[in-house]
């Protein structure tokens, strides 16, 4: 009983932190939720082969309400580019469905290494290349452009994150101010998390290794504990984000990703 109380408290705290980070960086909070959930599932004795799948799926489910809360807070400050969302949304959505299917076919250890590697690359870019030359002066147009949002959706769904991890980096490369990139990424979180969650529910529905209290790979207990806390704290993160300069926000984002990536590398390789 005491173990369950500790785990419940840890998940509530994770939801609070994830909500603040969702508002602060537009990331949906998944990059915090996934490692914590993976650890909690290990304590509960969930099969290691599907532990990461459950963590990623549950993270995506919690990002649905969190991204709505975060995007609304940023939109009130005029920091959501709805034109980009309209042009990219369908490709992000299709990529998210593909990512959920790919993730369901991989072993948890492989999924964790992919998660950590991509997070580390994004972190290095944000820290060491934040002031570097942009790829273009504006969002590009052309027949090849859908590949970009499709990759964002696919990679984000595989990792259980809301899209901010890749959306913020991509939009800043295309000369978008980081505050607007963060706000726009928050809305992409909904576009990614909804189809991604559905994909994980379907692919995990008949998996006999799934623990009791799950809907497919989604832990309903984890969702019930994390989601409300993250929704309540997301607006606070948005207010904090607009209090920092663009450079400082980039450095904070990069440092945060390095810590998260390092921890996952350690767990996956140990």
What are these regions (language model features)?
Residues 4-20, 24-87, 91-92, 146-153, ...:
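Small-residue-rich hydrophobic segments that form or flank transmembrane alpha-helices
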Residues 64-77, 117-140, 238-239, 261-270:
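Transmembrane helix exit motif
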Residues 73-87, 106-113, 134-139, 239-249:
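Interfacial helix-loop-helix linkers and transmembrane-helix boundary segments
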Residues 1-3, 42-54, 101-110, 270:
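Helix-coil boundary and interhelical linker segments in multi-pass alpha-helical membrane proteins
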Residues 98-102, 154-162, 196-202, 259-270:
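Hydrophobic alpha-helical transmembrane segments in multi-pass integral membrane proteins
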Residues 92-93, 97, 108-128, 218-235, ...:
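Selective transmembrane alpha-helices of multi-pass membrane proteins
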Residues 101-108, 205-217, 268-270:
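Membrane-interface helix termini and inter-helical loops of multi-pass transporters
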Residues 24, 34, 76, 105-106, ...:
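Helix-loop junctions at the membrane-solvent interface of multi-pass transporters
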């Amino acid at each position: 009983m005491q173990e369950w109380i500790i785990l419940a408290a840890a998940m509530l705290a994770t939801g609070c932190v994830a909500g603040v980070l969702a508002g602060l960086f537009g990331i949906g909070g998944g990059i915090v939720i996934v490692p914590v959930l993976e650890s909690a599932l290990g304590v509960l004795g969930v099969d290691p082969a599907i532990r990461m799948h459950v963590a990623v799926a549950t993270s995506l489910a919690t990002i649905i309400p969190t991204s709505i809360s975060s995007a609304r807070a940023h939109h009130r400050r005029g920091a959501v580019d709805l034109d980009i969302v309209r042009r990219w949304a369908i490709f992000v959505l299709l990529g998210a469905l593909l990512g959920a299917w790919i993730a369901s076919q991989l072993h948890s250890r492989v999924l964790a290494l992919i998660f950590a590697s991509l997070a580390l690359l994004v972190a290095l870019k944000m820290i060491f290349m934040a002031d570097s030359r942009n790829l273009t002066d504006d969002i590009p147009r052309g027949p090849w452009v859908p590949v970009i949002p499709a990759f964002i959706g696919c990679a984000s769904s595989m990792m259980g994150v809301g899209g901010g991890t890749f959306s913020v980096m991509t939009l800043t490369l295309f000369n978008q101010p980081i505050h607007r990139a963060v706000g726009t990424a928050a809305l992409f979180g909904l576009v990614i998390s909804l189809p991604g969650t559905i994909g994980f529910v379907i692919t995990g529905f008949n998996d006999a290794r799934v623990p009791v209290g799950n809907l497919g790979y989604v832990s309903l207990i984890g969702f019930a504990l994390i989601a409300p806390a993250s929704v309540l704290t997301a607006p606070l993160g948005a207010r904090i984000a607009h209090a920092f300069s663009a450079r400082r926000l980039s450095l904070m984002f990069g440092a945060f990703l390095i810590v998260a990536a390092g921890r996952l590398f350690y767990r996956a390789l140990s």
